Amino acid sequence: MSVKKKNTPLDRYRIYLRLEKGLSLRTLEAYMSDVEKFAAYIAEEGGDLLAVELEQLRDYLATLVDVGIHPRTQARLLSSLRSFYGFLKMDGYIESNPTELLKSPKLPMHLPDVLTLDEIDRVIDAIDLSQLEGQRNRAMIEVLYSCGLRVSELCNLKISDLYLDEEFIRVTGKGDKQRLVPISPRAIAELNYYFNDRDHIEIKPGYEDYVFISERRRKPLSRITVFHIVKELVGDAGIQKNVSPHTFRHSFATHLLEGGANLRIIQAMLGHESIATTEIYAHIDRTRLREEIFEHHPRNKHCKNNK
């Protein structure tokens, strides 16, 4: 019986990390995961992992910035790529290391905070459902995190934008550009609970189609109101981080990337698609977009584990 040899560059790099570097399994898998994310990105771009050029690396890092990936995560990903391409050069796969000319991302004095899934659950658990606005706020947080919306997109979301049976919502972003974004079953459930309460609000004429309504003003929530609601809920949850509505968008992108989602799809879901990205994904149907997000979003994994 013959033993199949592992001779791909990624296979040999894994062996190198385990045997020569002596890394723990957890650290080894972290390195491999980072490199595999980049390998998937290069493959989607039609490139060759062994013939990567400096400009491709810069585009990758620029895309990480574009989708709001935490600077520390950016720095870690680059460190992993430096290690991988250093190995490829040492082992004779390539003549020069393309990462040598790349500068590490500068870490600002104050880094944007990202919430863990546990912290997001704590924020939701801190909501008092006995209050009139309780279920609205619960649905609001779930939609922010499930869909990675900007606060302005949340405030402008309309009932006519919801395709809940298909598990999609239509989002109008900057420049009035529209995109379809998958919405999780949990967020859909919270919205349906909220709509039961919303039916009892006498909404001012002209605003009936807006999803999130202020009970007191009987009009759509403003951005400032959402900001204050989030601040209050985070304080009630005992979380000592600087959190705004945008934090949920950062967390959405970071958790998807860490979970292995396709970087270009994350970019498209956030409404940051470039002309090139739009061309690349023009042929991808809604089913793939939905499956990609649902497979890698920790909220959906969390739901599956509790079924």
Protein language model features and the residues they cover:
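Conserved catalytic core of the tyrosine transesterase superfamily
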Residues: 1-307
